[in-house]
């Protein structure tokens, strides 16, 4: 992907995508911009060899590797039980250099994990601003997280090119990504054990359950395994049946309001 020669003007590209999509894309400009930044970050990570110990997971992996129509925000990876931060040394500067290379008017800040951070997850927080951006508008912020947990069904595959009209996105990004069945397991566990309603996870669960290549029984088995990986066996045992009571959530105004930020209007009916 090209840099400061002006061929990766992500804001202009996103505006063109939204305009071409018609009225149904009107609310999606921020997440379209973010998706173009996802491509840029993943391309840089691949070129610098950071994928060797990581497996892509989460909502963005569904969108970029498995064809979900729902836009997403952050980048999530499984690093394995023996994950070592030293394997990602230089990741922050890799991301910063790549995003800064989009143009002289782009400012990038990458907040790296604390060296003494404990727990299962390490998080990089990436903030991007352009010179012409109104000061009252927030920076584009993307969280990149690596969890010290295993992936049980990794698949080696390319990221999808969602916008073939832009040559800057034509480079092939290849990485390991969890299977749709394993991602469903993650979503089941997250939805059941979270302290708050995770409406996007619920939408993803419904979309995954409709696919012919997803084994729902296997997903429940994996969710139980993963509850141990995350230290949430007790919560999972107590709340696994929470996923059965989703009809009221799906029919709520709050669910519709949240999903409007991530889905084209044609999928909201």
List each language-model region with its residue ranges.
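Glycine-rich beta-strand-to-loop/alpha-helix junction loops that act as flexible
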Residues: 57-60
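Anion-coordinating catalytic cores for phosphoryl-, nucleotidyl-, and glycosidic chemistry
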Residues: 72
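Structured mid-to-C-terminal alpha-helical surface segments
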Residues: 1-55, 65-68, 80-269
């Amino acid at each position: 992907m090209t840099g400061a020669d002006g061929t990766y003007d992500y804001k202009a590209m996103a505006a063109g995508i939204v305009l071409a999509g018609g009225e149904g894309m009107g609310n999606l400009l921020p997440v379209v911009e973010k998706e173009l930044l996802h491509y840029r970050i993943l391309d840089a990570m691949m070129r610098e060899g950071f994928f060797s110990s990581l497996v892509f997971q989460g909502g963005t992996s569904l969108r970029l590797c498995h064809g979900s129509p729902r836009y997403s925000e952050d980048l999530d990876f499984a690093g394995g039980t023996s994950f070592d931060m030293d394997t990602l040394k230089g990741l922050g500067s890799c991301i910063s250099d790549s995003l800064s290379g989009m143009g002289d008017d782009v400012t990038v800040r990458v907040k790296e994990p604390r060296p003494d951070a404990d727990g299962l997850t390490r998080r990089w927080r990436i903030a991007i601003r352009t010179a012409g951006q109104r000061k009252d508008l927030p920076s584009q912020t993307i969280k990149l997280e690596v969890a010290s947990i295993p992936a049980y069904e990794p698949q080696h595959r390319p990221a999808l090119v969602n916008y073939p009209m832009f040559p800057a996105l034509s480079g092939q990004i290849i990485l390991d990504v969890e299977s749709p069945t394993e991602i469903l397991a993650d979503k089941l566990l997250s939805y059941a054990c979270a302290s708050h309603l995770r409406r996007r996870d619920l939408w993803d669960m419904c979309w995954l359950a409709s696919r012919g290549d997803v084994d729902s029984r296997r997903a429940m088995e994996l969710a139980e395994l993963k509850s141990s990986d995350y230290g949430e066996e007790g919560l999972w045992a107590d709340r696994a049946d929470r996923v059965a009571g989703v009809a009221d959530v799906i029919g709520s105004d709050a669910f519709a309001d949240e999903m409007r930020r991530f889905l084209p209007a044609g999928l909201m009916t």
